[in-house]
Amino acid sequence: MAGLINKIGDALHIGGGNKEGEHKKEEEHKKHVDEHKSGEHKEGIVDKIKDKIHGGEGKSHDGEGKSHDGEKKKKKDKKEKKHHDDGHHSSSSDSDSD
């Protein structure tokens, strides 16, 4: 079990088992800093998901700024019509019982 965990740790480069030669050089660390410091703000994936869930910046889930109120109202009206139509029709079996 411990061997398996150590193999996973080595593959993901986590844990304290690194040798001196395997450490990143200081130049490699600084090389990536320039990529992150461009002029625009990079939004994290968590922030993007939160915006989609909560409808951030006034946008709806489809991303076009449309309101879903009309769709909800249509569904509600359709549901009400369906309930009003149920059970008040005469069927062929009703006419046979006379």
UniProtKB/Swiss-Prot annotation:
The induction annotation reads:
By cold stress.
Single GO cellular component annotation?
cytoplasm
Return one GO MF term: nickel cation binding
Q: Where is the composition biased (Basic residues)?
A: 73-82
Q: Where is this region: Disordered?
A: 1-98
Q: Basic and acidic residues bias: where?
A: 19-72
**Where is it localised?**
Cytoplasm; Nucleus
Subunit structure of this chain's protein:
Interacts with PXL1.
As for family, the record states:
Belongs to the KS-type dehydrin family.
PANTHER family according to UniProt: DEHYDRIN HIRD11
What this chain does, per the entry, is described as:
Intrinsically disordered and metal-binding protein. Binds to the divalent cations cobalt, nickel, copper and zinc, but not to magnesium, calcium, manganese or cadmium. Binding to metal ions decreases disordered state, decreases susceptibility to trypsin and promotes self-association. Can reduce the formation of reactive oxygen species (ROS) in a copper-ascorbate in vitro system.
**By what name is this protein known?**
Dehydrin HIRD11
Organism encoding this protein: Arabidopsis thaliana
